[in-house]
C-alpha cells in the first residue's frame, strides 16, 4: 500500500462522524485522566441535550464539549460551539447539577481534536469557557 492509499483508508475510517467523534472523545478523556482527573460520565444525556465528558479535577467539576476534525475538513472546533450548542450545554449541565444536588466549583472546557494528514493527532484544550456568564472556579 502506497502513502496515498494509506491516507485514503485512514481518511475513510476517521471521516465517519460516529467514528471520528467517538475517537476524539476517547482521546480527550485519556488526556484528562493523564492529568489526574476522574471521568464521571461520557455522552451523558438530559433529554435531547448531551455533555461529551463530565470529569472531576480535584474539587472542580468539569463539563467538556469535544470537537473532532480531520485536517482536510478542518475549521476551528471551538468556533463550532455556537449559541445553540452553548444553550444545549447549559441545559445539560444544569440538569447534571440538579441531579447531584449542585457543586460549589465547576467549569466548561472545549477540547479540539485535530487528526492530521500524517495520522498524528493534535489536542487543544480551552479551559473555563464562560457559558453561564462569570466563571465559577
Feature locations, PLM:
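Structural motif
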Residues: 48, 61-63, 105, 123
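Acidic-basic catalytic patches of nuclease active cores, encompassing PD-(D/E)XK
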Residues: 1-42
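Domain-level recognition of nuclease-like catalytic cores that cleave nucleotide substrates
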Residues: 99-137
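Mid-chain, well-packed structural core segment of small domains
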Residues: 74-104
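Conserved catalytic cores of phosphodiester-cleaving nucleases, focusing on short active-site segments
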Residues: 32, 51-74, 81, 89
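Residues at secondary-structure transition points
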Residues: 19, 23, 48, 72, ...
Amino acid at each position: 500500500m502506497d502513502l496515498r492509499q494509506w491516507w485514503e483508508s485512514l481518511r475513510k475510517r476517521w471521516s465517519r462522524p460516529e467514528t471520528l467523534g467517538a475517537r476524539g472523545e476517547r482521546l480527550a478523556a485519556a488526556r484528562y485522566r493523564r492529568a489526574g482527573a476522574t471521568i464521571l460520565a461520557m455522552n451523558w444525556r438530559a433529554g435531547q441535550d448531551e455533555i461529551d465528558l463530565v470529569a472531576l479535577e480535584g474539587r472542580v467539576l468539569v463539563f467538556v464539549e469535544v470537537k473532532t476534525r480531520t485536517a482536510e475538513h478542518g475549521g476551528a472546533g471551538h468556533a463550532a460551539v455556537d449559541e445553540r450548542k452553548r444553550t444545549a450545554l447549559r441545559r445539560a449541565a444544569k440538569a447534571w447539577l440538579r441531579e447531584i444536588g449542585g457543586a460549589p466549583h465547576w467549569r466548561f472546557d472545549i477540547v479540539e481534536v485535530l487528526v492530521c494528514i500524517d495520522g498524528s493527532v493534535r489536542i487543544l484544550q480551552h479551559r473555563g469557557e464562560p457559558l453561564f456568564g462569570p466563571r465559577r472556579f
